[in-house]
Amino acid sequence: YQTGNYQQVKIWQQATAQAPALLDRALDPKADTLNEEEMSRLALGMRTQLQKNPGDIEGWIMLGRVGMALGNASIATDAYATAYRLDPKNSDAALGYAEALTRSSDPNDNRLGGELLRQLVRTDHSNIRVLSMYAFNAFEQQRFGEAVAAWEMMLKLLPANDTRRAVIERSIAQAMQHLSPQESK
């Protein structure tokens, strides 16, 4: 039993009270962006709200985004994992979870993230964001043929004047340099 934590309890209570206003501000494109301290308070307040309402999928997804913005891998991964467990068909939850896993320093997380991205590509091979994340993950995992295939699919989907095309074409060229002569045919 510990005493003297009044200040920490007060900070927690303030964060919980401020969370709705901070969230509104974070979602308003015209409002000032939240600084890191405000984002931390938002995360604390959101975690408290989600303890009261653990089935709030959108809340878990938003907490995952806040965790990513803070660079807090455990908050992001845990929040997205919870959202994904609640609704595996929710594309925002699945893609957020895959992104958090692929950014992890744990090779097993990277593998799981790659598997989830492969599932997402099979489900919707016209989602540019999914294809992009899949391609970069495949490249990082040295699966260069898969990366090239995903980037080529993106080129088919993007308009001719899209500025991303040049980056994708350079990425394809870089991946092709890593392929063996038999693979690049």
Which residue stretches match the model-derived regions?
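Residue-level signature for tetratricopeptide repeat
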Residues: 49, 66, 100-103, 137, ...
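TPR/TPR-like (Sel1-like) alpha-helical repeat modules
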Residues: 139, 144-162, 170-173
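Alpha-helical linker/edge segments of TPR/alpha-solenoid repeat scaffolds
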Residues: 104-111, 173-185
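Long, contiguous interaction/recruitment modules in multidomain scaffold/adaptor proteins
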Residues: 1-44
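Alpha-helical adaptor scaffolds
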Residues: 26-35, 39, 57, 61-124
